[in-house]
């Protein structure tokens, strides 16, 4: 993909649309095995060179302050696979590895980051009467490093996990999914994340879903808040940033409408509510020359509704 035509329709001397050169290569292999057991491997490579900024910018200005520009080189490769063990029970080993490298500048502020993620899990899928049970164990390796003040040393952690899920089919119209996941993070201790999902299908054209659960997320500040890298404001981190934690619930209604001429319309409506016990929200208002980050004082909520027609 290539887009290299700078546009400035509002005449502010800044590009209106990000310019980019991108290449992506993907390949998947499926292996034929006895008893139709699954074994597949897929690989992908991605490279992108994107920039935006003043209309006069070109790569010779990269990293300087003579002409402002934001330039990002991204190189990423990943491999993933799924292997069904040659045993009577249905047990799969799933694995993946990704390597992500970002070389970027925001004016004369460099942001250099590397992330490597390795993942493997064993999943046992067992059907018993009206129950479809998934039982599994996983391990995740994460390496992250960048050149910002928020990362004094490379962040390297291995997180083991256990999880169980039971989907109960009461009738053809109703089912209930119960799940629990346990992770151990050496930085944050024991992490439990339960979830519940109810599905009701009163007709072939109507589906109602109700989901609830908890959330836990470690924030990588500068990968998510690029405004902190532009150099326009000083970045202030007032305390050690804790993980974001939340409780959430959402309801979804899906309606299919068939017309006599053969056309199909799908109406999708969702509403959600999230209660955060901690969230990392940038403060742009206290000081116009600073972006201040700290842990949430109290709680925060997020509510919303969406409607889509397809």
Predicted regions and their residues:
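Outer-membrane beta-barrel transmembrane domain signature of Gram-negative proteins
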Residues: 64-86, 95-177, 297-308
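Membrane-embedded beta-barrel scaffold of Gram-negative outer-membrane proteins
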Residues: 1, 90-104, 201, 209, ...
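Structural signature of Gram-negative outer-membrane beta-barrels, strongest in the C-terminal barrel
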Residues: 34, 42-44, 83, 130-134, ...
């Amino acid at each position: 993909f290539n887009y290299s035509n700078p546009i400035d329709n509002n005449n502010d001397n800044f590009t209106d649309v990000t310019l980019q050169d991108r290449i992506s290569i993907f390949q998947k292999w499926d292996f034929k095995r006895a008893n139709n057991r699954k074994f597949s491997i897929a690989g992908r490579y991605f490279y992108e060179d994107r920039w935006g900024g003043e209309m006069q910018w070109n790569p010779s200005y990269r990293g300087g302050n003579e002409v402002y520009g934001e330039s990002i080189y991204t190189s990423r490769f990943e491999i993933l696979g799924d292997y069904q063990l040659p045993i009577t029970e249905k047990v799969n080993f799933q694995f993946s590895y990704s390597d992500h490298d970002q070389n970027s500048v925001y004016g004369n502020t460099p942001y250099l980051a590397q992330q490597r993620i390795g993942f493997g899990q064993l999943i046992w899928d067992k059907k018993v009467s009206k129950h479809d049970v998934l039982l599994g164990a996983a391990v995740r390796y994460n390496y992250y490093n960048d050149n910002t003040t928020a990362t004094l040393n490379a962040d390297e952690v291995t997180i083991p996990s256990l999880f169980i899920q039971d989907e109960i089919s009461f009738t053809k119209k109703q089912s209930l999914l119960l799940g629990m996941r346990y992770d151990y993070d050496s930085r944050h201790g024991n992490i439990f994340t339960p979830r519940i999902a109810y599905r009701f299908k009163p007709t072939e054209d109507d589906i109602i879903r109700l989901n609830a659960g908890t959330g836990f997320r470690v924030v990588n500040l500068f990968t998510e808040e690029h405004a902190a890298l532009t150099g326009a404001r000083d970045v202030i981190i007032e305390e050690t940033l804790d993980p974001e934690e939340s409780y959430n619930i959402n309801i979804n209604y899906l309606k299919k409408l068939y017309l006599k001429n053969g056309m199909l319309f799908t109406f999708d409506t969702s509403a959600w509510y999230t209660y955060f016990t901690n969230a990392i929200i940038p403060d742009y208002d206290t000081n116009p020359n600073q972006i201040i980050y700290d842990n949430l004082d109290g709680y925060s909520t997020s509510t919303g509704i969406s409607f889509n027609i397809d």
